[in-house]
């Protein structure tokens, strides 16, 4: 990747809450998709499932994003490696800043899908490569429902789960609005299995016939 260098202090990532994060940045102007990217803009390397570099995503200080014409997008991703839950849980997020947020809060590995359109193919590839992993779609909560719907379809395809942020937008929006601790709690709450109802293990008639103290024990 010529005309790039690793550095921190990127304007876009600073706005997203990560001023000290080191990323790959442009060192020269590059025009693609009708947008002129400048030195200091983010470069997100994208790899296929074999680990070959197949494209990059460029992000300017305003958050405009483009991939290079002719490069692979479907099934391509950027991976932020984590040490916690390695081999046990894998996250997939739409955007780079969202993925950074999830990684920062969990310490776990996160795949960057670039867009909701790529979630399905990426989730399927992830399941093939990691058959024993829990796969979590760190979805966007869109006003039009697009992020939620595509994440749900991807989760169905890979037998994964969806973690929706409590606010409209993405997990980075939650992070900026509510801070790290509250967002960390929200993200783990989103993937916690629901409490088992007493009716899951007995009939309603059996539950009704129990004494008040027995019911209390069952519910709590």
Regions found by a protein language model. Name each.
Residues 1-4, 21-23, 56, 77-79, ...:
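Generic hydrophobic, helix-prone segments enriched in Leu/Val/Ile
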Residues 15, 20, 26-28, 58, ...:
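Generic structural "secondary-structure junction" signal
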Residues 88-91, 96-200:
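TOPRIM fold recognition
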Residues 1-41, 84, 193-200:
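TOPRIM metal-binding catalytic domain and adjacent DNA-binding surface shared by DnaG-type primases
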Residues 197-220:
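The Walker A/P-loop phosphate-binding site
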